[in-house]
UniProtKB/Swiss-Prot annotation:
PANTHER family: PEPTIDE CHAIN RELEASE FACTOR RF3
Keyword Nucleotide-binding: yes
Annotated binding of GTP, by residue: 18-25, 86-90, 140-143
Keywords tagged on the record: Cytoplasm, GTP-binding, Nucleotide-binding, Protein biosynthesis
Disulfide bonds: none
Physiological role: Increases the formation of ribosomal termination complexes and stimulates activities of RF-1 and RF-2. It binds guanine nucleotides and has strong preference for UGA stop codons. It may interact directly with the ribosome. The stimulation of RF-1 and RF-2 is significantly reduced by GTP and GDP, but not by GMP.
Name listed for the protein in its UniProt record: Peptide chain release factor 3
Cell compartments where the protein resides: Cytoplasm
PROSITE patterns xref list: G_TR_1, G_TR_2
Species this chain originates from: Legionella pneumophila (strain Corby)
Species classification: Bacteria, Pseudomonadati, Pseudomonadota, Gammaproteobacteria, Legionellales
InterPro entries: EF-G-like_DII, EFG_III/V, G_TR_CS, P-loop_NTPase, PrfC, RF3_C, RF3_dom_3_sf, RF3_GTP-bd
Length: 526
């Protein structure tokens, strides 16, 4: 095994964030292509094409061409182990994305050159801000006409409140796109429309004043020289400390679909991006160089392999090393478990791993005992913090077409809710099942997966619930009285936590006023 593979400092764990359709999944594919993880990149738009993007592997994603769940992929580049977490671009899956951002050390933001900063990017950036996550930026689709690069940098700075340091700079765009200039290497990489699926080495010209540049790109050479002078005066120089503190984003330009500008980004990413960072627990801060193992579960995915009807818990290793066959304490349930078959991932492909270090993501087989937010250690009582659970904003009543399938329905809903993509509520006063979600597409996903993976066909009806809140109280007497008086509005969620289901916002406000000793919470930590 290579030396670098056994060094946690050589780990780079990051997520890609963007607005839908900025080209995030294509960028993911091309990073894997240049990282040597795949030989041929699939393309995302060819919905019916034979070759699908490696990271979009769930049936429904293949049909719709959108990334719904977070994929985890590991590959090696320049003697570093890179763990790439692809997040759903679709806004209905924000919870999955928020939780994924708790498991990474840095992020890559993808922006469409024609559209600039979009709403979803703003929201994701806010989440990164909470943790001061270092962010690199890739401005994509330079092979099409778009906005002026300098205007885009201004927009990123003003809307997202982060300084931009352009590392590469485009030579033209659209039909006039000739390549990119790397400001710190003083090299021009000439654009050639790469075969979409294979990597091609770009032709390089050393030096902005090289006469060869004028021969090859004509008038564009002088335009580039003028622009670079302007950029020097109008933009920030790259400062590594500011980037690592989340105050500055290095910016790269390119065309992911044509494999252009990605390699330069990847080379710099490996050099600049942070390795595994310390993590907060309720008890203390855990450092990645500690010898004993610790980690937390940030995602659960059911049926990654329909042939095996299994569930996998994705665990971020925070310290120490996982070694095959080791015993770990599953702290929430107070049990020691032996783990001999942890997995690593290349999107839908998985293989058993012998070793995982801080920064790595491993998959644990889950037979219903592991939940999002669970901590695993070698015995020390720790609870990692900051893994959010959001109260849903949309609700549906679920009815079975075949009443004999009620057992399968409950099993399916509980398993799907354990993934955190949807929530299931059982009202105390009836046998009904109510589904809650943050976005409308989640209901489609649940319906599709219940039908195909659990063979349960349901009818989904509107229900008289507008908002839900977790309810707690430190005063047992007040809680007991509240349970009696508000009985008709109470339900249990998939984890048996008590929730208040309010038919209207006014009803919720009145309940909060009437029961001052009860806390009504829109989020809770896992």
């Amino acid at each position: 095994m290579s030396d670098f593979y056994q060094d946690f400092n050589k780990r780079r764990t990051f997520a890609i964030i963007s607005h839908p359709d900025a080209g995030k999944t294509t960028v993911t594919e091309k990073l894997l292509l240049f990282g040597g993880a795949i030989q041929l990149a699939g393309t995302v738009k060819g919905r019916k094409a034979d070759r699908h993007a490696t990271s979009d592997w769930m049936e429904m994603e293949k049909e719709r061409g959108i990334s719904i769940t977070t994929s985890v992929m590991q590959f090696i580049h320049n003697q570093h182990v890179i763990n790439l977490l692809d997040t759903p671009g679709h806004e209905d899956f924000s919870e999955d994305t928020y939780r994924t951002l708790t498991a990474v050390d840095s992020a890559l933001m993808v922006i469409d050159v024609a559209k600039g900063v979009e709403e979803r990017t703003v929201k994701l950036m806010e989440v990164c801000r909470l943790r001061d996550t270092p962010i690199m930026t890739f401005i994509n689709k330079l092979d099409r006409e778009g906005r002026e690069p300098i205007d885009l940098l201004d927009e990123v700075e003003s809307v997202l409140g982060i300084q931009c340091a352009p590392i590469t700079w485009p030579v033209g765009m659209g039909k006039r796109f000739k390549g990119i200039y790397h400001r710190y290497q003083d090299i021009i990489y000439l654009y050639q429309q790469g075969s979409n699926a294979k990597k091609v080495e770009a032709m390089q010209i050393k030096g902005l004043d090289n006469p060869q540049l004028d021969e090859l790109i004509g008038d564009s050479a002088d335009e580039l020289r003028e622009e670079i002078e302007l950029v020097k005066g109008a933009s920030h120089g790259f400062n590594l400390e500011d980037y690592l503190a989340g105050k500055m984003t290095p910016v790269y330009f390119g065309s992911a679909i044509n494999n252009f500008g990605i390699k330069e980004l990847l080379d710099d990413f490996v050099e600049y991006a942070p390795g595994p960072q310390p993590r907060a627990t309720q008890e203390r801060v855990v450092s990645p160089n500690e010898e004993t193992f610790s980690g937390f579960v940030f995602k659960i995915q059911a049926n990654m392999d329909p042939k095996h009807r299994d569930r996998i818990a994705f665990l971020r290793v925070c310290s120490g090393a996982y070694k095959k066959g080791m015993k770990l304490s599953h702290l929430r349930i107070g049990k020691e478990v032996q783990i001999s078959n942890a997995l690593t991932f290349m999107a839908g492909d998985r293989s058993h791993t012998e070793l995982a270090l801080a920064g790595d993501i491993i998959g644990l087989h889950n037979h219903g005992t592991i939940r999002i937010g669970d901590t695993f250690t070698q015995g020390e009582q720790l609870k990692f913090t900051g893994i959010p659970n959001f109260a849903p904003e949309l609700f549906r009543l679920v009815r079975l077409r075949d009443p004999l399938k009620s057992k399968a329905l409950l099993k399916g809903l509980i398993e799907l809710s354990e993934e955190g993509a949807t929530q299931v509520f059982r009202p105390l006063n009836s046998n009904q099942l109510i589904l809650g979600a943050v976005g409308i597409l989640q209901f489609d996903v649940v319906a599709h997966r219940l039908k195909h993976e659990y063979k349960v066909d349901c009818i989904y009806e509107s229900v008289n619930v507008t908002c839900a809140r977790w309810v707690y109280s430190e005063d047992d007497k007040a809680m007991s009285e509240f349970r009696t008086k508000a009985y008709d509005y109470l339900a249990l969620d998939g984890g048996d936590m008590l929730m208040y289901l309010a038919p209207t916002k006014v009803n919720l406000t009145m309940a909060e006023e009437r029961y001052p000793k009860i806390k009504f919470c829109a989020t809770r930590e896992h």
